[in-house]
UniProtKB/Swiss-Prot annotation:
<feature type="compositionally biased region" description="Basic and acidic residues">
    <location>
        <begin position="365"/>
        <end position="379"/>
    </location>
</feature>
<keyword id="KW-0445">Lipid transport</keyword>
<feature type="domain" description="SMP-LTD">
    <location>
        <begin position="1"/>
        <end position="438"/>
    </location>
</feature>
<feature type="region of interest" description="Disordered">
    <location>
        <begin position="353"/>
        <end position="379"/>
    </location>
</feature>
<dbReference type="InterPro" id="IPR031468">
    <property type="entry name" value="SMP_LBD"/>
</dbReference>
<dbReference type="InterPro" id="IPR027532">
    <property type="entry name" value="Mdm12"/>
</dbReference>
<comment type="similarity">
    <text>Belongs to the MDM12 family.</text>
</comment>
<dbReference type="GO" id="GO:0005789">
    <property type="term" value="C:endoplasmic reticulum membrane"/>
</dbReference>
<dbReference type="Pfam" id="PF10296">
    <property type="entry name" value="MMM1"/>
</dbReference>
<dbReference type="GO" id="GO:0045040">
    <property type="term" value="P:protein insertion into mitochondrial outer membrane"/>
</dbReference>
<comment type="subunit">
    <text>Component of the ER-mitochondria encounter structure (ERMES) or MDM complex, composed of mmm1, mdm10, mdm12 and mdm34. A mmm1 homodimer associates with one molecule of mdm12 on each side in a pairwise head-to-tail manner, and the SMP-LTD domains of mmm1 and mdm12 generate a continuous hydrophobic tunnel for phospholipid trafficking.</text>
</comment>
<protein>
    <recommendedName>
        <fullName>Mitochondrial distribution and morphology protein 12</fullName>
    </recommendedName>
</protein>
<feature type="compositionally biased region" description="Polar residues">
    <location>
        <begin position="212"/>
        <end position="226"/>
    </location>
</feature>
<dbReference type="GO" id="GO:1990456">
    <property type="term" value="P:mitochondrion-endoplasmic reticulum membrane tethering"/>
</dbReference>
<keyword id="KW-0496">Mitochondrion</keyword>
<dbReference type="GO" id="GO:0008289">
    <property type="term" value="F:lipid binding"/>
</dbReference>
<keyword id="KW-0256">Endoplasmic reticulum</keyword>
Amino acid sequence: MSIEVDWAAATSGPDGEALAERIRSFVHDKFQEITLPRFIRSVQVHSFDFGTIAPDLEVKDICEPFADFYEEEADDADTSVASEELGHELHESPYEDDMTYNPTAHNLHSFSHHPYPGEGFQPSALRSPLGDHLNPHFMPRASTPGIPGGTSTLGYHMRSLGGLSGTQTPLAAVAGGTSFASGWSDSGMGVGPRSQAARPAGPHHLAEPDLDTTNSTSRPSTANTLPSHPSLGHSGSSGSNPHTSDPTDAPQPSIETSDDPAAEGHSLPIPPRMRERRPEDFQVLCHAKYAGDVRMSLTAEILLDYPMPSFVGLPLKLNVTGITFDGVAVVAYIRKRVHFCFLSAEDADALLGSEQSQGSQNPSDDGRPRSGGDQKDKELKRQGGLLQEIRVDSEIGRKEDGKQVLKNVGKVERFVLAQVRRIFEEELVYPSFWTFLV
């Protein structure tokens, strides 16, 4: 199902201008955080414009929102809205809450950014290797009684990976026809069994057949490891008196030190607070194609090293005149918030890969089979990322007698455009997303 977007109404007016200025300021601030090469002194972003060409949107699926969209921020500035919603949830229906909403209390384009958590950030429940709210559509595992967290090494490897992609993402569950709200009956995924497994086992919890007191060679000696408890090593010795009734000669469970931080008393990361799901929450997956005239103006100052290092700086003006985009957009509506992001190429293939492969096998419009070159071009575009093409015009220096001093400085162009592509894919591609208050 295709959607026609009134692009002029959505991007014009005071709200559209404010949103364009926020995007310009955001991209400009990101360039100030980038380590520039030696031949570039600074990069400035001067303007951003949405253009006049609207994207083509085709609805692929309507499903339940991703679990990440329900996470509550610790520094959420919209505490008044949350308290108001809580009061309505206790005494009124959600439909009455929408009817009593005051539209003047919020700005249409007030938004917050949720970047992908790196080092020093709390991982979300969707990617948390040990959290109780781990999405069951990833890799369910069973917990081993007596061992906190089970014997799985998934948490060790996922700390370095940071996230999952491909068929291990929530999109794989959507493509498979399953629901995000459904849970697993695995005992290792619940809060109760996990807390029970994390408790230290007492002597009455130990199985007696596991304690071998007849063969001293079947286990390592504890005489050197625990010198303060000589009875532990003496009980398993073959030279002990079998007729003594001293209770210290009875076999005692050995105390072993564990390298697990959870066993040493270190607290595990606190799982984020999750908002309650509502029946009216929904999420739309759209196939978005865009070949428009979005414009952005940047200036990069180039340093010349002749006749001495950093002798003079020349301004290089870059004008982005349009982009070509092909990807899957995610729009989730939860209460008075709209969450927006794009999916990576791997996640998009999990949903649209079968359709694209079928399209390559179907004949073309003139009845002839499609050539293999067209399929190769599609694969190359898919490997290039969501932004398939960025059209740019550049000029350097001042104009003298109507002629430019230099044109098309390729090295600077490639660097700046690569950073624009990186900022887009890191800040707008899931698991990063943007939240708008509506």
